[in-house]
Amino acid sequence: MSEFTEDQLQRYSRHIILPEVGGKGQKKLLNAKVFIIGAGGLGCPVGYYLAAAGVGTIAMIDNDEVELSNLQRQIAHSVKTLGKPKVESAKNTFESLNPDVNVIALKQRISKNNIMEFIKDYDIVVDGSDNFPTRYLVNDACVMAGKPLVSGAILRFEGQVTTIIPGDGHCYRCLFEEMPPAGLVPSCQEAGVLGVLPGVIGGLQATEVLKLILGKGDVLKNELLIYNALKTTFRKVKVPKNPDCPVCGKNPTITELLDYDAEYCTMR
């Protein structure tokens, strides 16, 4: 254990004592690089738990500022950071929790023009976005780049999580081939969301990330996990890989990233 400082041995002692983690596993976490899309309801708990676990490099991208309505569920922010960029607020929170962690704050919008450059040096991508254009863009980019993706979504009292391993299982388009028509599915702003729900789903996403880094346990490959907060139920839905999927199928028809946002706005 000489590769750890005394502080690290204490900080990560509950990890190191686990046979499935140990010193080698903790080193994997410290050397890992994770890219989180969104510093809101899902990105906050994902980043917080990954920072606590000692994931060495965490990048977050988000173009928004902290608003009072965020504080009902976005645990990395506070009244002291109102009006400040969400990524800077989250960076300060995570680095205050664990100075071992390098948090890279990117205050900009993810797009087809920058996503491949952003994710190329990261081991795992986490999607904590709150809109369909971003969700499809992230899925397609990760499939094309061969990057594992942990995707989460929340609305009202329900959340879902799935893990996508390009070349070894389904992708988001195997589940939902095309975006729903604009306006069909309301946003959290329009329909609301239970404040604790992002914590449950974000915690599950963080768990998937840690298992991927450690190479332990079973991840949600070819499965969609659905949580209902009102009923306190979890259920798994099988999601087989679609051989005719336009992105990850045998003969993909989508071979370059599209301007999903413009397409979605046009549908509105």
Enumerate the language-model features and the residues they cover.
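Adenine nucleotide-associated cytosolic modules
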Residues: 1-268
